[in-house]
């Protein structure tokens, strides 16, 4: 099963680590310094009782990642309209899209 998380902030990063820990083929769409850090060092999650780093596939360009079984959108709600065209390379008729977008006031 291939899962892509679009938005690798706090929520997307957390989900990415948890999915990778159980062996899911997970990729993340990110940008800037956070993207470069993930490519170089993996994705790190520090919790009360643990500190884990997992290797992940990450790209700024969704075309690099191919079709996904699930696309999880973890952007702030006001950003979602701007990514509609960008997610097209990730989805086909079998892809399930889940939006965990949050409203920030």
Where on the chain are the PLM-derived regions?
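N-terminal glycine-rich dinucleotide-binding loop that anchors FAD/FMN and/or NAD(P) in oxidoreductases
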Residues: 43-58
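Short, functional N-terminal and low-complexity linear motifs
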Residues: 2-7, 51-52, 74-78
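NAD(P)+-binding Rossmann beta1-loop-alpha1 motif at the extreme N-terminus of oxidoreductases
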Residues: 1-47
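Short His-Asn-centered micro-motif
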Residues: 99-100
């Amino acid at each position: 099963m291939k899962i892509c998380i679009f938005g690798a902030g706090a929520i997307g990063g957390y989900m990415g680590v948890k999915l990778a820990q159980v062996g899911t083929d997970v990729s993340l769409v990110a940008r800037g310094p956070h993207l470069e850090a993930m490519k170089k060092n993996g994705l790190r999650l520090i919790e009360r009782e643990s500190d884990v780093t997992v290797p992940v596939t990450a790209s700024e360009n969704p075309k690099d990642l191919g079709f996904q079984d699930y696309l999880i959108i973890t952007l702030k709600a006001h950003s979602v309209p701007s990514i509609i065209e960008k997610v097209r390379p990730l989805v086909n008729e079998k892809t399930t899209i889940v939006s965990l977008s949050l409203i920030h006031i």
